[in-house]
From Swiss-Prot:
Keywords recorded for this protein, A-Z: Early protein
Paired cysteines (S-S): none
Pfam families listed in its UniProt record: ASFV_360
Name of the protein this chain belongs to: Protein MGF 360-16R
Function: Plays a role in virus cell tropism, and may be required for efficient virus replication in macrophages.
UniProt GO BP: taxis
Transmembrane segments: none
Organism: African swine fever virus (isolate Tick/Malawi/Lil 20-1/1983)
Induction details: Expressed in the early phase of the viral replicative cycle.
Family named by the database record: Belongs to the asfivirus MGF 360 family.
């Protein structure tokens, strides 16, 4: 049950007030100031999110009660920890990111279970498996700069995160810091499952995430996100094509890179090398013609049937009309239900 003081603060936080009330709000404990925040604390009447400062939309700047509590624990702001806990924040999440013994004791005094053993890893896996905007944001906030992860098996953790994210988070296991790896992991999970609120939150809170957002968009075949990321990120079209070819059936990503000037012959060979044959046939439909090199590569990979098929002189090229500009709407309409034309040519040849 809420204390009378917590109820009074909640009543004030859910109402509108002017700048003339700011001195009172500071005294009243409804003010949050740290390195990134400095303003009055408000509660959105529609979604119960916490906002700090004069923001008209909590979607853009708000945080759930749990996230507000987690960030208060990281700030070591005792009064806000107590307040957000009374308002309904889950103090167990606070205990998982308590960065000093005194903060840990405070969380436990407010009802948190003492974190033990696998509780940290179990929580990380659980929050990413629910595929929920708020849970991904909670996971990011709990484990960002969390010193407890210094004591886990880093190689095993990195492999697990990469497998769950379904996208290469790094080139080599020792090439990236754990903090950056986790940031990429939460972002990749949000993009993979199209969790727009989480994506928007991470775009605003994870520094230098834009280059990785382009990689995610290419890997998960989203021309709209590719188009958006290309406004702020500069990447060589052939490097973009390499990323697009790593996941099969990425026709829209491949076509976008092709329109930017990426080498479609190189894309054909990369797709074959990755074992993504649908991508390879799509490149042939676009005009790729390095059949001699492709046959040699198929032979090295012991794909004898494919090696023979690629030697047939039956293929048609440039079967897809090029767009003038890489317009994501046109690309999606053109390729959403695309049928590989040269695959049909092969079937027709053998069925005659």
């Amino acid at each position: 049950m809420l204390s009378l003081q917590a109820m009074a603060k909640m009543a004030v936080a859910t109402n509108t007030y002017s700048k003339y009330h700011y001195p009172i709000l500071k005294v009243f404990g409804l003010w949050w100031k740290n390195n990134t925040l400095n303003g009055p604390i408000k509660i959105c009447n529609h979604c119960n999110n916490i906002t700090v400062g004069e923001y008209p939309m909590c979607y853009n700047h708000g945080m759930s009660m749990d996230v507000a509590l987690i960030r208060a624990v990281k700030d070591r702001n005792i009064s806000l920890i107590q307040l957000f806990t009374e308002w309904g924040g889950n103090i167990d999440y606070g205990a998982l990111c308590a960065n000093t013994p005194s903060m840990q004791r405070l969380c436990e005094s407010l009802g948190a279970k003492p974190p033990k053993g696998r509780m940290y890893m179990d929580t990380l896996i659980h929050l990413s498996d629910t595929l929920n905007d708020n849970d991904l944001i909670r996971g990011y906030e709990i484990f960002d700069d969390n010193s407890v992860l210094d004591y886990v098996n880093l190689v095993r953790l990195k492999i697990m995160l990469t497998l769950k994210a379904r996208i290469p988070l790094m080139e080599q296991l020792d090439q990236i810091a754990l903090k950056q790896l986790l940031q990429r992991y939460w972002y990749a999970m949000a993009v993979q499952h199209n969790l727009r609120i989480a994506i928007h939150y991470f775009d605003n809170h994870i520094p230098n995430i834009k280059p990785f957002s382009l990689r995610c968009a290419l890997y998960f075949n989203d021309p709209f996100k590719i188009h958006d990321a290309c406004r702020t990120v500069t990447m060589d079209p052939n490097e973009m094509m390499n990323i697009a070819c790593q996941q099969d059936l990425n026709f829209q990503s491949i076509y976008y890179c092709y329109l930017l000037g990426a080498d479609i012959n190189q894309a054909m060979l990369m797709s074959l090398n990755y074992g993504n044959l649908s991508n390879m046939w799509f490149c042939i439909d676009l005009g790729a013609n390095v059949f001699k090199e492709a046959r040699a590569l198929a032979g090295k990979k012991n794909r004898r049937v494919l090696q023979y098929i690629l030697g047939l002189n039956i293929f048609k090229r440039e079967l897809i009309p090029p767009c003038k500009d890489p317009d994501p709407s046109q690309i999606q309409i053109l390729l959403k239900n695309y049928i590989l034309k040269n695959v049909s040519t092969v079937f027709t040849y053998y069925c005659q």
